[in-house]
UniProtKB/Swiss-Prot annotation:
Protein name according to UniProt: Aspulvinone E synthetase melA
Modified sites of kind O-(pantetheine 4'-phosphoryl)serine: S601
Keywords from the named record: Cytoplasm, Phosphopantetheine, Phosphoprotein, Transferase
Organism: Aspergillus terreus (strain NIH 2624 / FGSC A1156)
Annotated GO CC locations: cytoplasm
Gene Ontology BP terms: fatty acid biosynthetic process
Gene that this polypeptide is encoded by: melA
Swiss-Prot/TrEMBL catalytic activity: 2 3-(4-hydroxyphenyl)pyruvate + AH2 + 2 ATP + O2 = aspulvinone E + A + 2 AMP + CO2 + 2 diphosphate + H2O + H(+)
Length: 925
């Protein structure tokens, strides 16, 4: 029979199985844990409850604060307070900041309406500086001599009464006391146990403080309910040594434990290192069924890799169970028991958190509170017996947290897929908005940590937005824990540069970076940083001194190492760069590459225009290729000095020069230009990225007169930069055909081409090429550049039919969006040349028939042009699938978001680059 009150859990476990144990490891002690049976725990807690009942501050049914720094004390006094007829309220670790610590104690006192706290002698000092709460040392109570039979608690609880108070993390402000009832907790435990059956003679493993809902309910109380042993270890010992975590699971035949994503990654890394050792360790993990994971987003890649490793030691493949839960839901209540297969099958970068256990229901709603259909992002709401009913003494917060029809508003965003699985999208209140674009702070933090930046401590990175007085948009603030010594200024500057570049790549915005000492970056018992608390401290000015010192040291370093202009021309250009990018000389000198400051294609064009105005050019006479090939002030000055000297055409444009992997070569679309690749290249930091640009843009250049002419030019360009393979080439639209032909030529000459990518182009294109005359090429170019809409381009195709080129050109210029036209620094002569290049590229492909084969091909397909196919499935299955006729292995297809003209544009480039990088890796590149 299911117990209805929490004390019954311990009483039943003690009576049913006197040998069931709580096994406790103290800090630093790995060999000799303390073991206490459930029967002995009940006897000890009963004695302690007498001391609680007899204390002068005792009030039946009231909340009693508990503040201890070890598992045993928390467990004993949790039960003592319950058995005394009171409500235990377990506090998290107090802040190291005296001001914050006092404020927190005063807040706890007013919330709980209590003036005392049970603690240990060693922790009394933490209550200094305040009068709101009186610490009572349990060592002074003389409870060991009490008779367990003398407990005369007069309060008889009901299932709906509050059994336990736990505190929210405060991620949305001051912590709130969550009222968890007996019925709610028992319902939650029963629901959790039904998700994954656990073997007999196994145990639960906990490594976080009992103040966390996962430790007290998901481990301690659930183990009692399941009649299984439970093992408690200090978190710092486990996190510092993942191998010991594996030892514990094997030694105690652990069936259920938990680990957030950051710790899963550490376990994976430890196992990989173990496999490389001369004598690899082995573990029997055949009893392991359930590694719950939550508290932060789980990456499918990490879960997949670790699952495979754990499987080799006897665990099931689905042993890692990502989930969702809150203090308000008694920890995990939504679980994905099909990870990683489900997430891989659905192409999820971050795992789904699954479906509801018994006792809870979920829905996703819009801003009006209406439930949304599968696939649409909205607000996550929960209901059911497992969900709490109120925050203690906080009716305003309670009312705000529930809808009119009684659903709990979690504050998280998510979508439900067609199978009812939940995919989270971050907390609504944590979203960063920069210039109208929304970013997830977690994704920015992940991006920074995934780059393994030297000088930055993993898992101590926190990102948030802040609106400075007078600012029109928020700025991104990123704080981190450095690994370098405070006096190592070069490392300080290099770390800031590396972080800045990653954030710029992720958001297009330069971050405000502050290194902080560890005391200012406290973690919860689950190893999480509180974004809201850190943000609040920043906005209160608590990091101002650290920020000022950091800025001063880096500025001094820049001044000592910066390269100064050699002449007035370089000085003038440098001033233009600084003004265009809105940065200071401390951040940029004559030898800083422009792409290191996160420049995009629009900023590049604006820079070009500013330089032309500075030089007094009446027309746009500086080819964009000059800026693409000469990315520093010094290089550009030399290039401009030679601008009017005869220059041989070079198709190679360096978009990203760094990285130790083989380069990626990107071939222009039908417009011939490579600006479309600039945003994509910013995300590819592990290898150089080169683009191949068509001939004919510069004054005096003639466009290609045949496919062979273009292929030979591009082949020579590739060989000049990368003499040896393996090669990776990809083309966007029209460029896919050229990438295919260049790949064939490389293979014919004995080179290995390991990756050929087609961005949304089928192999047979000549009929489409023949349809595009000069007018159509110009109209497509105008639409591609966002000068006119697609609808208007189709209308103009009819209206301008039969007119001469000059008339057509002027008509399109007249129709063009004037702001966009100016933004792109276009001129009539240059737009005309651009149309010539596009037309000649299409003309020479009018008789193109693909032949031959390459080793492999990856096709990235998006929503096609309406004229090309009626649907995405038709596009893939009928047209793109024909690439199979021209490869020596089956084509790999990659479904990417967006439409043909937007698939690598700003809206979709972040998703596209992740798919592209994964495809490169799968090809061994």
């Amino acid at each position: 029979m299911q117990p209805s009150l929490i004390p019954s859990l311990l009483e039943t476990a003690a009576a049913r199985n006197g040998d069931g144990r709580v096994i406790l490891y103290s800090q630093g002690n790995r060999e000799d844990p303390r073991s206490i049976t459930y029967r002995d725990l009940l006897e000890t807690a009963s004695k302690a409850s007498v001391a609680v009942h007899n204390h002068q501050n005792y009030t039946p049914g009231a909340a009693v604060l508990l503040h201890f720094n070890n598992h045993l004390d928390n467990i004993v006094w949790f039960w003592a307070v319950l058995l005394a007829g009171c409500i235990p309220a377990i506090t998290p670790a107090f802040s190291n900041n005296p001001v914050q610590r006092v404020a927190n104690l005063e807040h706890l006192s007013s919330t709980l309406i209590t003036d005392w706290c049970l603690t240990s002698q060693a922790l009394l000092v933490e209550f200094a500086g305040q009068d709101a709460i009186e610490p009572v040392s349990v060592e002074t109570l003389g409870w060991e001599k009490a008779s367990p039979d003398s407990n005369t608690a007069s309060v008889k609880a009901k299932p709906t009464d509050t059994a336990l108070l736990l505190f929210t993390s405060g991620s949305t402000g001051k912590s709130k006391a969550v009222c968890l009832s007996h019925f709610q907790i028992v319902s939650a435990i029963a629901g959790k146990l039904s998700v994954v059956p656990l073997p007999e003679q196994s145990s639960f493993l906990n490594w976080v403080g009992l103040d966390h809902v996962a430790a007290i309910i998901e481990i301690h109380l659930q183990a009692l309910y399941a009649d299984l042993d439970q093992v408690h270890v200090p978190g710092s010992d486990v996190i510092s040594d993942p191998i010991w975590f594996l030892d514990l699971m094997a030694t105690h035949r652990v069936s259920r434990t938990f680990a957030p994503n950051f710790f899963l990654a550490r376990i994976r890394d430890a196992l990989v290192q173990n496999a490389r050792s001369a004598s690899p360790r082995q573990w029997d993990l055949s009893g392991l069924r359930y590694v719950a994971s939550g508290g932060e987003a789980n990456t499918t890649k990490t879960c997949d890799e670790l699952s495979q490793l754990l499987k080799s030691f006897g665990a099931p493949l689905n042993v890692i169970v990502p989930g969702f839960g809150m203090t308000e839901t008694c920890a995990g209540a939504i679980f994905n028991t099909n990870c990683p297969d489900y997430d891989k099958k659905h192409g999820l970068e971050y795992t789904s958190v699954g479906s509801c256990m018994p006792g809870i229901f979920m829905r996703v709603t819009n801003q009006q509170g209406d439930p949304l259909p599968p696939g649409e992002m909205g607000s996550l709401e929960l209901a059911g017996p497992v969900v709490f009913r109120q925050y203690l003494n906080n009716p305003a917060a309670t009312q705000e947290s529930f809808t009119m029809d009684g659903w709990f508003k979690t504050g998280d965003c998510g979508t439900l897929d067609e199978n009812g699985y939940l995919v989270l999208g971050g907390r609504a209140k944590e979203t960063i908005i920069i210039n109208g674009v929304k970013y997830s702070p977690h994704e920015i933090e992940t991006a920074v940590e995934e780059h393994n930046i030297k000088g930055l401590s993993r898992s101590f990175t926190c990102c948030f937005s802040s609106l400075s007085p007078g600012a029109e948009t928020e700025e991104i603030v990123l704080v981190y824990l450095p690994t370098y010594a405070p006096e190592d200024i070069p490392a300080r500057a290099a770390t800031a540069d590396a972080i800045s570049k990653v954030v710029l790549m992720s958001t297009g915005s330069r971050p405000h970076i502050i290194p902080l000492e560890q005391a200012l970056l406290p973690k919860s018992t689950l190893g999480k940083l509180s974004r809201s608390k850190i943000k609040a401290a920043y906005e209160r000015g608590e990091y101002r001194t650290h920020d000022s010192i950091n800025r001063s040291l880096i500025a001094r370093h820049r001044q000592a190492t910066r390269a100064s202009p050699k002449n007035d021309f370089e000085k003038g250009l440098l001033e233009i760069f600084l003004r265009s990018f809105k940065i200071s000389e401390d951040e940029f000198d004559v030898q800083t590459p422009i792409f290191d400051v996160g420049i995009d294609s629009i900023e590049l064009i604006n820079l070009k225009r500013d330089i032309e105005q500075h030089l007094g050019f009446a027309d746009a006479t500086i080819p964009i290729i000059i800026l693409l090939e000469n990315t520093t002030v010094r290089e550009l000055a030399a290039a401009l000095d030679n601008l009017y000297r005869p220059k041989e055409y070079n198709p190679v444009v360096t978009l990203q020069a760094h990285g130790d992997k083989n380069p990626l070569w990107l071939v222009h679309p039908g417009a011939g230009e490579v600006l479309i690749f600039i945003n994509l290249a910013k995300f590819i930091t592990d290898r150089p990225v080169y683009a191949l640009r068509a001939r004919g843009f510069d004054e005096g250049e003639k466009p290609f007169d045949s496919i062979e002419d273009a292929v030979t030019s591009y082949y020579n360009g590739v060989k000049s930069k990368q003499p040896h393979g393996p090669y990776a080439l990809a083309g966007y639209c029209y460029g896919s055909m050229l990438a295919f032909e260049v790949a064939k030529k490389l293979e014919e000459n004995g080179d290995e081409v390991r990756f050929v990518g087609s961005f949304n182009l089928p192999p047979h294109i000549k009929m489409r090429m023949r349809e595009l005359d000069w007018k159509e090429c110009l109209l497509h170019l105008a639409y591609f550049l966002d000068l006119i809409t697609q609808k208007r381009s189709r209308e103009l195709a009819v209206e301008l039919d039969g007119l001469d080129q000059d008339t057509i050109l002027q008509a399109i210029i007249d129709e063009a969006d004037k702001e966009r036209y100016a933004q792109l620094s276009l001129s009539r002569p240059f737009l005309s040349r651009w149309a010539d290049v596009a037309y000649e590229l299409h003309r020479i492909a009018g008789d193109y028939d693909p032949d031959g084969r390459v080793a492999s091909m990856d096709v990235f397909f998006s929503i096609p042009l309406a004229i090309a196919a009626a649907s995405k499935s038709e596009w893939r299955n009928v047209h793109l699938s024909q690439w199979d006729d021209f490869t020596r292995s089956h084509v790999r297809f990659h479904d990417v978001p967006g439409e043909h003209y937007s698939m690598i544009g700003p809206e979709h480039v972040f998703a596209f680059q992740k798919i592209l990088r994964s495809a490169l890796a799968e090809r061994g590149m």
